[in-house]
């Protein structure tokens, strides 16, 4: 998914998170005195990213106000502002400028906060971050890794996230990027984890793996690979993040194996959280899909989450990305990821939103 992944990440930086208020039923029995059937529960909180369908402040606020009614979590997932950092601007100043007000607004909605500091090009895992490439720099440089540590320490101190991600889709990086880049990601993430621990951070530290890659890659027929190496290389992780876009591998949501998540989670003690993913609501390229298939995926996803008593589900897109507003050059694979939102780009609902709302109505319980 490396090339598509790059475009996906660009598209996915925006969409919104939709908190849903859980309505609890009355405590008594039925009218005839018989006990009511038990309410369906969930162990997983729900959430989105605040990225908007179009790049305007009004769309950001409108999206947050909508999805915060159907979520408990929010995630900011992005590459680092390397240009400013390596020009000497402090991480704290950058966060004050770009993130503190947003984080406060999100917390005002009652949302628990997650942050992923992505170390490579989310749109092309075989490459370093775009700003580093433009500067002729590399994550393999000790000075660049120091800037990364300073940034995540500032994120911890200024934004106080409940969950703090230090590396994304590590197995895909190992598969697609050079050994030197992967080794640098391992080093940088582990050193950052040590620095956060030494600083007394209370955030739950995590990294993520790409589920389709772990099952053998995109398309049907690849052999199961697993994530053993990732568990060893990122042993600091207190939570195991999953990235999953199974429409690249399966024609229908019902084709996803029942052990799609549990096979990866078995034998390791960390709780699981889906930190990004989705299913397109439209056919694109060789992929055939529909709004109804996307809604069925949401229902199937709940079964997979229940199978691992997951901690959370985060979808980076709440609304579709309006590709006409993406500044050129538009990545060639971006259309593969622009229609995984639960609403259209004008925030009108798709069938998948009703399916999501049904999940949100479940009573939230301890995992």
Model segments located where?
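N-terminal secretory signal peptides and thylakoid transit peptides that target proteins
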Residues: 1-22
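C-terminal motif of bacterial Sec signal peptides marking the signal peptidase cleavage site
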Residues: 25-26
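N-terminal substrate-binding region of glycoside hydrolase catalytic domains
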Residues: 37-143, 165, 241, 247
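Aromatic- and acid-rich polysaccharide-binding/catalytic face
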Residues: 76, 162, 168, 221-254, ...
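Active-site groove signature of glycoside hydrolases
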Residues: 151-180
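Aromatic-lined carbohydrate-recognition surfaces of secreted/lumenal glycan-active proteins
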Residues: 189-222, 273-278, 312-318
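Catalytic-core region of carbohydrate-active enzymes that cleave or remodel glycosidic bonds
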Residues: 256-311
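Aromatic-rich peripheral "rim/lid" segments of glycoside hydrolase catalytic domains that contact
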Residues: 284, 289-291, 316-367
């Amino acid at each position: 998914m490396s090339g598509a992944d790059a475009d996906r990440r660009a598209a996915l930086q925006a969409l919104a998170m939709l908190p849903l208020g859980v309505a609890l039923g009355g405590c008594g029995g039925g009218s005839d005195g018989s006990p009511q059937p038990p309410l369906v529960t969930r162990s997983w909180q729900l959430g989105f990213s605040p990225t908007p369908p179009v790049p305007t402040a009004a769309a950001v606020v409108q999206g947050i106000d909508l999805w915060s009614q159907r979520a408990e979590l929010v995630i900011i997932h992005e590459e680092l502002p390397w240009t400013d950092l390596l020009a000497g601007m402090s991480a704290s100043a950058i966060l004050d400028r770009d993130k503190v007000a947003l984080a406060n607004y999100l917390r005002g909605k009652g949302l628990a906060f997650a942050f992923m500091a992505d170390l490579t090009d989310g749109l092309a895992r075989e490459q370093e971050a775009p700003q580093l490439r433009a500067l002729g720099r590399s994550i393999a440089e000790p000075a660049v890794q120091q800037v990364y540590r300073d940034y995540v320490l500032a994120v911890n101190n200024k934004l106080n996230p409940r969950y703090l991600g230090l590396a994304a889709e590590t197995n895909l990086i190992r598969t697609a990027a050079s050994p030197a880049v992967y080794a640098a990601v391992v080093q940088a993430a582990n050193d950052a984890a040590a620095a956060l621990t030494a600083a007394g951070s209370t955030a739950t530290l995590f990294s993520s793996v790409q589920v389709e890659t772990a099952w053998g890659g995109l398309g049907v027929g690849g052999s199961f690979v697993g994530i053993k190496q990732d568990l060893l290389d990122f042993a600091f992780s207190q939570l195991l993040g999953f990235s999953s876009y199974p429409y690249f591998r399966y024609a229908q949501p019902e084709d996803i194996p029942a052990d799609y998540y549990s096979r990866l989670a078995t034998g390791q003690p960390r709780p699981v959280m889906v930190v990004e993913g989705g299913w397109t609501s439209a056919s694109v390229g060789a992929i055939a899909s529909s709004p109804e298939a996307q809604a069925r995926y949401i229902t199937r996803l709940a079964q997979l989450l229940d199978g691992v008593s997951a901690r959370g589900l985060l979808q980076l897109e709440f609304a579709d990305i309006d590709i006409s507003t993406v500044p050129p050059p538009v990545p060639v694979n971006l259309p593969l990821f622009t229609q995984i939102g639960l609403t259209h780009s004008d925030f009108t609902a798709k069938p998948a939103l009703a399916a999501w709302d049904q999940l949100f109505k479940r009573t939230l319980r301890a995992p």
